Amino acid sequence: ASLVTSFEEA
């Protein structure tokens, strides 16, 4: 996962 999707998956 990238730094963008890291909070979207959280």
From Swiss-Prot:
It comes from the Bacteria. Keywords: Glycosidase, Hydrolase, Secreted. It is an enzyme of class 3 (hydrolase). One of its GO terms (cellular component) is extracellular region. Belongs to the glycosyl hydrolase 16 family. It is found in: Secreted. Its main location: secreted. This is Beta-agarase AgaA34. Optimum temperature is 40 degrees Celsius. Active at temperatures up to 50 degrees Celsius. One of its GO terms (molecular function) is beta-agarase activity. It catalyses: Hydrolysis of (1->4)-beta-D-galactosidic linkages in agarose, giving the tetramer as the predominant product. GO terms for biological process: carbohydrate catabolic process. Its EC number is 3.2.1.81. The keyword Secreted applies. Optimum pH is 8.0. Active from pH 6.0 to 10.0.
